[in-house]
Curated annotation (Swiss-Prot):
This is Putative Nus factor SuhB. It is found in: Cytoplasm. GO terms for biological process: inositol metabolic process; phosphatidylinositol phosphate biosynthetic process; ribosome biogenesis; signal transduction; transcription antitermination. The gene is suhB. Its EC number is 3.1.3.25. Mg(2+) binds at residues 67, 83, 85. It comes from Burkholderia cenocepacia (strain ATCC BAA-245 / DSM 16553 / LMG 16656 / NCTC 13227 / J2315 / CF5610). Homodimer. The rRNA transcription and antitermination complex (rrnTAC) consists of RNA polymerase (RNAP), NusA, NusB, NusE (rpsJ), NusG, SubB, ribosomal protein S4, DNA and precursor rRNA; S4 is more flexible than other subunits. Belongs to the inositol monophosphatase superfamily. InterPro entries: IMPase, Inositol_monoP_metal-BS, Inositol_monophosphatase-like, Inositol_monophosphatase_CS, Inositol_monophosphatase_SuhB. Disruption phenotype: Grows more slowly than wild-type at 30 and 37 degrees Celsius, has defective protein secretion, swarming motility and biofilm formation. Increased susceptibility to polymyxin B and SDS but not to kanamycin or gentamycin. No change in the ability of bacteria to infect macrophages. Disulfide bonds: none annotated. One of its GO terms (molecular function) is metal ion binding. Might be part of the processive rRNA transcription and antitermination complex (rrnTAC). The complex forms an RNA-chaperone ring around the RNA exit tunnel of RNA polymerase (RNAP). It supports rapid transcription and antitermination of rRNA operons, cotranscriptional rRNA folding, and annealing of distal rRNA regions to allow correct ribosome biogenesis. This subunit may play a central role in organizing the structure. Transmembrane segments: none annotated.
Amino acid sequence: MHPMLNIAVKAARRAGQIINRASLDLDLIEIRKKQQNDFVTEVDKAAEDAIIETLKTAYPDHAILAEESGESDNESEFKWIIDPLDGTTNFIHGFPYYCVSIALEHKGVVTQAVVYDPNKNDLFTATRGRGAYLNDRRIRVGRRDRLADALVGTGFPFREKDGLDAYARLFTEMTQACTGLRRPGAAALDLANVAAGRLDAFFEQGINVWDMAAGSLLITEAGGLVGNYTGDADFLHRHEIVAANPKIYAQMIPILNRYSRVHPAAE
């Protein structure tokens, strides 16, 4: 295992221990509302602090971009992108679908990825050019080649002015185009499950970089494609993502393209 990935795994497991301990008595957790339908808990903060401490002990000069504490002001060609608890709403309701997501970006390219599911003790890892793994077993995206047969994950708009009407139209189209649409509520884990072939595809708009950085590398290392709704590979800071194996990806783009908020550079 790459040494930087090894440190990220250590950090993710530390965060997972904090999350698991807290999940034993959810009534004691302090919950704060960041904005409409968007929550943060003391557990998010404690998990994030543990991750940052672990990473900074090993790599004190690396930059940090984390969901709760924001972006560090130091300049470095290495940047850790962290979501300490993706699926906070699930967590506070006791719905066991959430994860820790950690990615390392080197000169703007994601090179290391960890997504850790503390409920199942499932550890998804990837190093650029070395494949994607689930609990040390090599994983690949699914083999289905028709969107009509695909199980597709997504995320629903949950904030005001997030385009719910447009999404409702897209939801209708995609529901008719695939065999089933699922919204578990933790994008990083959804992407990891696409990499493992448990879901055939995933799409979401209004998504943040820390929700998709690690998962996107897992998918490409597992043989899949990742891009924005236009099909362009420029997605990481565009707040929209589609991911699937190459054949299903190609069938999703004509549907998603009409709903994209990204305008190609040529336009």
